[in-house]
Amino acid sequence: MKLQLVAVGTKMPDWVQTGFMEYLRRFPKDMPFELTEVPAGKRGKNADIKRILEKEGEMMLAATGKGNRIVTLDIPGQPWETPQLASQLERWKQDGRDVSLLIGGPEGLSPACKAAAEQSWSLSALTLPHPLVRVLVAESLYRAWSITANHPYHRE
């Protein structure tokens, strides 16, 4: 199983790149984790936000692998504690399909992305900046993997 993070935005601050890459390099070879970035639409005073969301959504869905399980990152999604996420990761592995996790831009995800999702995951009831979500998702998935592999990274 391959994990794919599909995220809106291509110019992240150095701390985001550094944090994300730190966890990305830790993933085992039998569970590759990759980042696919789609460009954010131009937002200005007269921007058509609905159209921007639609376009970003189209690009995100086009970037996912055919047949991939799509999981959105969204506030109203299912909150998982770390052991629950580890169990979820195991179920995804048993399913045999690759998993694409979608992170929207400043206004969130398009209705098409939400409709295509088999699952929706809520990291927090807080509104989080989408660059930070990249790092949190990578760390959370690495921690979940460490539980399933009996790796000492996670401590109860």
UniProtKB/Swiss-Prot annotation:
Q: Where does S-adenosyl-L-methionine bind?
A: 73, 104, 123-128
InterPro entries from the UniProt entry = Alpha/beta_knot_MTases, RlmH-like, tRNA_m1G_MTases_N
The record ties this protein, via Pfam families, to: SPOUT_MTase
Q: Which keywords fit this entry according to its UniProt record?
A: Cytoplasm, Methyltransferase, rRNA processing, S-adenosyl-L-methionine, Transferase
Q: What class does this enzyme belong to in the EC scheme?
A: transferase
Gene Ontology cellular component terms for the protein in this record: cytoplasm
- Which Gene Ontology MF annotations are present? rRNA (pseudouridine-N3-)-methyltransferase activity
Instruction: Read off the SUPFAM superfamilies from this record.
Output: alpha/beta knot
EC numbers, comma separated: 2.1.1.177
Q: Where in the cell is it found?
A: Cytoplasm
Catalysed reaction(s) here are: pseudouridine(1915) in 23S rRNA + S-adenosyl-L-methionine = N(3)-methylpseudouridine(1915) in 23S rRNA + S-adenosyl-L-homocysteine + H(+)
Q: Coiled-coil region(s) at which residues?
A: none
Which HAMAP family is this protein grouped with? 23SrRNA_methyltr_H (MF_00658)
Q: How does it assemble?
A: Homodimer.
| Similarity comment text for this entry | Belongs to the RNA methyltransferase RlmH family.
- Role played: Specifically methylates the pseudouridine at position 1915 (m3Psi1915) in 23S rRNA.
By its UniProt entry, which NCBIfam families does this protein fall under? PRK00103.1-1, PRK00103.1-4, tRNA_RlmH_YbeA
Name-wise, this protein is Ribosomal RNA large subunit methyltransferase H
Species of provenance = Erwinia tasmaniensis (strain DSM 17950 / CFBP 7177 / CIP 109463 / NCPPB 4357 / Et1/99)
Q: What gene makes this protein?
A: rlmH
